[in-house]
């Protein structure tokens, strides 16, 4: 048994959502079982490399921990932002939709992902997702306090650190124009 997770995709699903270059320069994580044989792992790796993927082999636990931060937590946040928008009266919802900027559009794109798949991910990886939510909540509380204190210096420090992480993601090749993941 040799599970693979191509870390590529969009909020769209089904046969019509396919893109020929979807896996190009994207990571595929292979999490072989303890009984997997090396020649079989190499075959699976070669398959993904042929599709244009970069391949990384890791344990299922390492995969789940990393993805709880890089993928699952952003979905939690996106669903909660949408829920917050929907908590307003209809007129305000319409105004929010009409004047939505890139930030909200990006979050709603993520929140438009396939519900059944995300239900299953949230249930199957619940412990690590809850751990990520706890860390996020702690950081959000700290940010809330900085905002309440009107601590401009601390806000700039937080924003600059965030900017540096973004630069690191770009430098690592994890933000490219191709394939287009619905960001345009």
Tell where the protein language model's regions lie, with residue ranges.
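Long, positively charged, glycine-interspersed low-complexity recognition regions
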Residues: 164-184
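Short, flexible, solvent-exposed loop/turn segments with mixed acidic/basic and small polar residues
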Residues: 16-22, 119-120
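Internal alpha-helical scaffold of NAD(P)-dependent oxidoreductase catalytic cores
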Residues: 21-106
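Alpha-helix N-cap/loop-to-helix initiation residues
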Residues: 11, 36-37, 129
